[in-house]
Amino acid sequence: MSDKLPMAVIGTGHFGTYHAQKIAASEQAELVAVADIDLARAEAVGERLGVPAVSDFRELFGKIDAASVTVPTQAHFDVARECLERGIHVLVEKPITDGLATADALVELANNRECILQVGHLVRFSGVAEALRRHVTRPLYIDSVRIAPFSGRSTDVNVVLDLMIHDIDLVLSLVDSPILAFDAAGAPVFTDHEDICTARIKFANGCIATITASRISFKTERRMRIFQPSSYLSVNFDSQSLSIARRAGDGVSATAVDIREESYEEVDALEREIGAFIACVREGRRPIVSGEEGRRALEAALIATRELQAHTRFVMEVSSDQGLARKVGS
């Protein structure tokens, strides 16, 4: 292997462009080319970064050892599969695929080919998220909120697969227990898919997690609160700050609470994610967000989607019945 890992970015949309920029600037990797079925779009990115552009990613086989797969979700499986079959290590954007069968197939293929398969759950690479994992011991209750103004992106999927899956993945990494029950409710607002959702997860160890995500908001807010024996943690992902409250005294009657505020430097999470992927390829070690973990997050997100869609159908049916009743009674 050369000094720099030869890589390509497959898919030069919004996220793919960022991937290409980070890889081009990396001292550990060489951006060999970018690929997109929309050649003009790929050429625009390639020209800015000084690399060739192709419309068929297969033209790059034999020239690269790793790839960022940043195509639309429904194409994740086909593109990642062909790369893995050729022994190319893959960093695939979240969610890993759009179904469990295809996710399982990718994980198995990566293992068989001894390739690194990393899933792009970006939140894991923020400084405050790394600190959070050091402080969380036995979570009893988790409350998570992720809301943002409407961007018009990722409207081909609901808000669970667009935004909430980030927090589902983080919660699953904090709670070492199987999921016992799952329910979700929400509604479509600006798109044909649900744009807001609140999900409630009950784990076998008794922990409860409530996760809210919305892509229809007047502001951006990303926070999480974790309650565990003798301590409470509040995370603000926007300001990269962590507040920790602990019982300062002994005994049930003790009222003193010790509060500590921690702030973390704003880091380039995507740069760290790509750097971690490159290190895993070079050192042959398991990624922070492996294919298996990406699959687990997808499974939970699909359960949430199923519950969410059932709720939406119920609301629509009730609204339709009420409308008919008003019409008959008029």
Listing of model-derived features with the role each one plays in the protein:
Residues M1, A66-S68, A276-S330:
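C-terminal helix-rich "cap/oligomerization" subdomain common to oxidoreductases
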Residues T97-S154:
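A contiguous active-site-proximal alpha/beta segment in oxidoreductase catalytic domains
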Residues I168-S241, E271-R285, D321-S330:
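Contiguous beta-strand/loop segments that form the cofactor/metal-binding neighborhood of enzyme cores
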Residues M1-L49, V171:
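N-terminal Rossmann-like dinucleotide-binding module
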Residues H19, L49-V107:
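Beta-loop-alpha module in the N-terminal Rossmann-like domain of NAD(P)-dependent dehydrogenases
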Residues I37, E261-G275, V289:
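Active-site loop of classical SDR/Rossmann-like NAD(P)-dependent oxidoreductases
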Residues G120-G127, F150-A181, E293-G294:
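Mid-domain beta-loop-alpha active-site segment that forms a flexible
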Residues S55, V92, L117-V119, D143, ...:
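Hydrophobic residues in well-ordered beta-strands that form the structural core
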